[in-house]
Amino acid sequence: MAKKSKQMRAALEKVDSTKAYSVEEAVALAKETNFAKFDASVEVAYNLNIDVRKADQQIRGAMVLPNGTGKTQRVLVFARGAKAEEAKAAGADFVGEDDLVAKINGGWLDFDVVIATPDMMAIVGRLGRVLGPRNLMPNPKTGTVTMDVAKAVEESKGGKITYRADKAGNVQAIIGKVSFDADKLVENFKAFHEVMVKAKPATAKGTYMTNVSITTTQGVGIKVDPSSF
């Protein structure tokens, strides 16, 4: 613990907490100040001046990062017949119907993404209390309720991320790993930032992005200047 505290202090000394860095500077600092002994994730966080209690100010969606996330996603698909076969051919890790519902209700959660065809949502809905709190419930807004299961599986395997503003207007997302080249992290960050800009509700007032930051799994938060993108 003492060693970790020393490493954290050393990392903090390299970051000016009063400064908002350019996206390139921030990415370089995030890599430099990471002291985890594993290939840590690089995460970005946005604090948005929105009121999610209003239906027209809720922000939620999905996108495919140009350079992926560096994480292998375990994809589960609820489908039957030809659609089940399409999901399997596309590389889904688990495909089924009621058998998967029973397995999940029994405590099994060894998957990262859940996709379903629209006709399967009646049985998937029974898993709301399990999947909902974990942000795993299929949703049309994130492209996880779809008839094109092959595309959904391929995107999930290829670097697709989902995002959602919480009650305080915070949005967080993983944009890669520390082992990524800096330019690839910058490209991913810029792609996600563009999505956040376009997601601004028409009814939002005042400064939309009140804070943007980047960090690693065990690193320090680094403020980013939104105008540098």
Swiss-Prot record:
InterPro entries: Ribosom_uL1_bac-type, Ribosomal_uL1, Ribosomal_uL1-like, Ribosomal_uL1/biogenesis, Ribosomal_uL1_3-a/b-sand, Ribosomal_uL1_CS. Keywords: Repressor, Ribonucleoprotein, Ribosomal protein, RNA-binding, rRNA-binding, Translation regulation, tRNA-binding. The keyword Acetylation does not apply. Gene3D superfamilies: 3.30.190.20, 3.40.50.790. One of its GO terms (molecular function) is tRNA binding. It comes from the Bacteria. One of its GO terms (biological process) is translation. GO terms for cellular component: large ribosomal subunit. Belongs to the universal ribosomal protein uL1 family. Binds directly to 23S rRNA. The L1 stalk is quite mobile in the ribosome, and is involved in E site tRNA release. HAMAP family: Ribosomal_uL1_B (MF_01318_B). This is Large ribosomal subunit protein uL1. It comes from Streptococcus equi subsp. equi (strain 4047).
